[in-house]
Amino acid sequence: MNANPKFLSADAHVDAAAVAPLPNSRKVYVTGSQPDIRVPMREITQADTPTGFGGEKNPPIYVYDTSGPYTDPDAKIDIRAGLPALRQGWIEARGDTEVLDGLSSQYGLERAADPATADLRFPGLHRNPRRAQPGKNVTQMHYARQGIITPEMEYIAIRENQRRAEYIESLKSSGPNGAKLAAMMGRQHPGQAFGAAAFGANALAEITPEFVRDEIARGRAIIPANINHPESEPMIIGRNFLVKINANIGNSAVTSSIGEEVDKMTWAIRWGGDTVMDLSTGKHIHETREWIIRNSPVPIGTVPIYQALEKVNGKAEDLTWEIFRDTLIEQAEQGVDYFTIHAGVRLQYVPLTANRMTGIVSRGGSIMAKWCLAHHKESFLYEHFEEICEIMKAYDVSFSLGDGLRPGSIYDANDEAQLGELKTLGELTQIAWKHDVQVMIEGPGHVPMQLIKENMDLQLDWCKEAPFYTLGPLTTDIAPGYDHITSGIGAAMIGWFGTAMLCYVTPKEHLGLPNKDDVKEGIITYKLAAHAADLAKGHPGAQVRDNALSKARFEFRWEDQFNIGLDPDKAREFHDETLPKDSAKVAHFCSMCGPHFCSMKITQDVREFAAQQGVSETEALKKGMEVKAVEFVKTGAEIYHRQ
């Protein structure tokens, strides 16, 4: 047996809270053109409108679901075995890959043979790694440029549409007022898309498989989907699709274990993490990553230079191209879907950071800057970029070109070092695209609000619309402990301007490693930012969920308000702090205004009065005002009265 029984029983589990379905929700699957294209969504059941408000049916709404099999009661979850290989059949059917006899990374072979790591290795089903056949290119971009719509692309189109058309049809058939209800619930404000696809206010605009293929072929979107991570559910990152969010996890030299990191991953995807980056820098990086990938239904990203540095005992100057290359192959054969590679940190840019307030704050950037200065040579990442592309396209690993010179304070925002690196990333993007390798560009950082759009505009210009992936940006530096908020502001703005994926920031940013509660707080904050950006862009159907919650709020359907929201648990908890009884869940008021001052209750009273008098709501309001005016004069025409 190659796994310690104590580890398996004590740590290798999924927290029960991470696998329970969310309240009034169930996992549903939408089948595509072939039986094995089964796209997961979360169906949220709603109560009927109370009789006093019309008594109409409220059909379920459907929302994007990143939780994988974990919230499916029918799934058998055993993280010691890993998840089912969802894409295995699609990969094999293309006939352009080969299964290797074993690992081809020297370090991977050493770890597999090391008895000291036997107790920590993933014990589940082991597949030999897969690689492109000689002369073949297995990237989704390559297929797209050949005019091929892959099952992954069809899966994504279904997923992005979130059954909007079916929801509108169910509204139309809900009763005599169905057509009116469908028009109301499907309405959304026109967006301002800043050059992205102009969907207008059309909630029913459909994302087609052909649209997905075209965006991938143009380089405006990526599908991170390593052929060695068949467990992943296909997703897309691009500004003409729903804004995505990434959650960072990972151990350090001083804290965390494999079990904790798997737990954080499942927790992050429960609350909406579209991808997860494993930024481990402590012990057992290789083993930790294997456990995470085998159990992850979302793409996994890494920063390979972190592990390469561990291999040279933390001495940046001892890094070599050969060590880094072996690390890329090691991680690609495990199934990492995208690599952050800081190839834009060039020797000529390092002196430009000398006058900064906060210097170089990127770990990867500082590692490469130190190497360049120690050898007074150009970065080996930049020099060997074409060779890196050859590795990427053999496994379909996507580039996340790292912003190693991003500003670490608003003082340093948009300076010469940051923008010089961005130009280089644009040049590297063109090289990667020659190889049909998928690329996204990482962005800042710390940027005040008035400079955010300039960042987005320059990235679109210099990087030819490759997807932008930003950390925030943080819009002020005065709030340690609240940087999920300072960055959420910037994230919403830059998402609106065109960023495709937002890297979450937790309350622990700059202070320490996040725990599970911090992960959830960061995820929810960034789901809000991403959704606000979708609304502002006018993305098809973005307002459906808002409309459903607003209707539930107006009709005092408290449980539906909780359940449609991003965090039903917190909403219910806050409500119950002041109105804990079950009777309060059907009351026509909350603790904010009480029973006599609820604006929505007053509106309902006006409507009832209008119906009783046989007049319009406007006439009812006018009559009510006339009655109150007479009453005011009779009581002395004084604004205030002593009781």
From Swiss-Prot:
The keyword S-adenosyl-L-methionine is annotated on this UniProt entry: yes
Keywords of this entry: 4Fe-4S, Iron, Iron-sulfur, Lyase, Metal-binding, S-adenosyl-L-methionine, Thiamine biosynthesis, Zinc
Transmembrane feature ranges: none
InterPro entries linked to this entry: ThiC, ThiC-associated_dom, ThiC/Bza_core_dom, ThiC/BzaA/B
Pathway(s) annotated for this protein in UniProt: Cofactor biosynthesis; thiamine diphosphate biosynthesis
Residues at which substrate binds: 248, 277, 306, 342, 362-364, 403-406, 442, 469
Disulphide linkage map: none
Subunit structure: Homodimer.
NCBIfam families according to UniProt: PRK09284.1, PRK13352.1, thiC
Protein name: Phosphomethylpyrimidine synthase
Species, as recorded: Burkholderia ambifaria (strain ATCC BAA-244 / DSM 16087 / CCUG 44356 / LMG 19182 / AMMD)
Upper classification of the organism: Bacteria, Pseudomonadati, Pseudomonadota, Betaproteobacteria, Burkholderiales
